Amino acid sequence: MRRLHIILGIIALLIAVQAIGGMLLGLLIYQATPNSVLTRQTFIGRIPGMLTSVRVIDRSMNILYRGQKPPEQLMHYDLAIDEKDLKAIEESLPTELPSPWYGNLFLTDDAKQWANATFTAGGETYKVKVRVRGDIFNHWAYRKKSWRVKFPKEKLFNGIREMNLIIPEDRLWFVEFLNVYRMRKFNLLHPPMELVTVSMNGSKPLLYTQIEHWTKEMLEKQGRTGDVNVYQTGGGNSYFQQWNPVFEEVGYWDKYFSKPTGDTYEEIDLLLKLSEEGAHKDPSYMRKLTTIIDTDRLVSWYVVSVLAGSRHVTDFNIRLFFDPSRGKFEPLPWDISIYVPRTLLFLPGNKFLNEAFRVPAIKLAAHRALWEYVQNDEQIADDYAERDRLYALIERSAYRDRLKLQSNRQVKQELEKLLWKTESNIEFIKDELKISEVLTTERIPSLADQQRGIIRTLDFTARGVAFAAFSEISIPQQYVELVEQGVIQLWRDDGNGSWGTEDMRISLAPLGEPNKDNLVVIETQDEALTLLWSEDPVLDANGSVKTAPHTQHRFFLISDGEPVDPDAFKSKIKVRNAVTGKKAQIIGDVVVDERTFERLDEAYMNREEFLKRYPFFRAEGEDGVALRGVHVINETVIVPSTVRLIIKPGVTLRFAKDASLLSYAPVTMIGYKEMPIRMRAVKENEPWGVFAVLNVTEPSAIQWAEFSGGGEAYINGTFFSGMVAFHNSPVTIVDTIVRDAHGDDGMNLKYVYVDINRVRFERNSADGLDIDMALSGVVENSLFLENGNDGMDISWSPIVIRNIESANNGDKCLSVGERSTPLIYDTILRGCPIGLAVKDDSHAKLERVRFETNGTAVSAYIKKPFFGEPSVSIIESTFKGNREKTLALSGAVITIDSAQ
């Protein structure tokens, strides 16, 4: 029996230990879990009666919290209200929404019932009037309420006419005191505040935030005149909304008290005009704003607000002081609160502030003041010391307050979170103001703009939190003297996108000696004109930032006199963070050559416009333009897609240096053997450009034509490597000569069906004929003689080559590359370093081809490593006098059957 008792005792002990351990673990979890999580995300909130039990358990743990000893004793008051009066106040309080449009129980004017009370402090007793205060139910729906206390005029309390005793959690315990501490550093007007304890009808001390109410006495004690208008905003007036949309109508505004000369609202009327969307774009907006409001104090208010991450100054939380002796508003910081950090891209919070801080000078001043504040280690240490003092002052009294709604666990969690928010906002601001992103685009001007003196158009897109500034431009040393003489000038665009005298000139000053790139730094001298500000971000439907802003700014670098070659003018731009002074983040830096597409509109002009511009063409038929005779082409001519180009037999076109003829129209160019059509250079040693046809669906035709002395061209975004070029434009070319080209190719065909017959390619500086991406087609009965590089070069092309002769070319008689699959027969390849080269996954079939006196008759290899091995199949062909018959590299295969 005794053994059984021992065993049962051990089991009971184990059960007790497990139970105690479970309770301790549960208590630990409970202490670490916010009530909202317990209620909404765990089973506790779904068990009837469990939540109430949990709260009882939670509050039963209050005794575990003691709090640190306060550094000083809080002032204590006694407030006694007759039970009947207290009951009457309770019964007058709202229990239902004023209307279905409201989101909260709201204290409307008819519920603001005053009662007599006795107020005792420091052994002195006062007969006072009291009522509950605060718009929202958290101030008066529970046992502990916020109060307005009014003292008799003949017996003020420490000079106070009215005071507010506010539940401290509404002002986030110590936070509003820290905000006020910062306000004093900026000399901002604010109501005096204290932490106090109050015994209500003999209760234990309850913690309150005491704020002196807005009265003339309060202002005069702070050295301000009391004969002023002090404006407030709020709600509860309308059936349709809880908070008044005060920037919609003057009538929504109210006053705490008025100046003696009259109870009028003209200054608010003006304020609303300055708050209208887009008002800041008015050139006189800044002058109007600084006339009606103290912008220095407005900036200081913003700094204090942002230091707390505040987003609490919307329509219903505005307090404004209008001093008729100065004719100016002063912002009155009120209930700033504190929030988790959020990007400074957000607008400040109401229509007036949003519009005012859209003025770049005001926002820049605010950001610089913020940066100066958060970079001052002594300043921040002082803030943290005051925060810690306030924490110590409040903690023990908060825990001992028996009527507060929260448990001590919740209070401690909230206090610790507020400590974190204080520091995280500071660190976040430091990081945010370092973000100054800019994209730069340097535009080489079109020929038309060059003639107007423009050297560069400089476009900046600002999208950072902090504004940027265009601070320097480095230019070649030879142009520095022109800057000093005022010939080279920098202008800021007025917004119309083009340079003119209405733009604003910026002073420039050269600095120092040339750097290793022979560039001299030129400093800009006017910060206001070189500021690169960011406008509003893109917001989603909920008002959250969706996309950072893209705000464009344009500058013109011009020469007022001596022309400057834009190609020789190399420059380097420096952009700095206008807030921190450090280098801005250039996230994109590109150059745009506006000459490239400056003539694109000519590609689709109508026939009448074309003929007016080029009268040596003549109209022919319904949509044709024709050329006859001999003409000198001094500039590039672009034939639009709206016509057909006919070049008559016997026409000779002599092109000046670099001049071209580009057609977006089909070309009919049929000469006679006795009257060929010729295109050549005006001067033999000055190559002209190209004759090119681009993106034409209808076929062109060339017969009995001669092309010589041309080169290459880059027109409307297309590079033409051939003196004669057809890109994506079908053509038949017969009985034609292509010689003495100075570019990469005598003729270049791209994306076409190839149809070349009886064409002579000779003495071209590089390739005679270059075919790229041909659909199919034939090159036949043609000669390729003494070209500087390849006689013919094909890429990505499945064509037939027959009955041609390619001889004495500088590199290859015939080059086949990039997956081409030609069939070559009845052809002579003679006198070249390489007769036939097949490369890069190309596969050539040859029949009856003669290889004579070449260095290497047939070569096959991989040139580009991402291609496969090529192959060559040769039948019924002859090899004579070649130094080397075949050379196969990189796995290439060359097969020869029935060769002689």
Predicted feature locations:
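Conserved oxyanion/phosphate-binding beta-strand-loop segments in alpha/beta enzyme cores
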Residues: 113-169, 703
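A short glycine-rich, hydrophobically flanked beta-strand micro-motif that places a catalytic Asp/Glu
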Residues: 191-197, 314-321
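Middle-to-C-terminal accessory/interaction subdomains
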Residues: 138, 262-269, 273-314, 320-321, ...
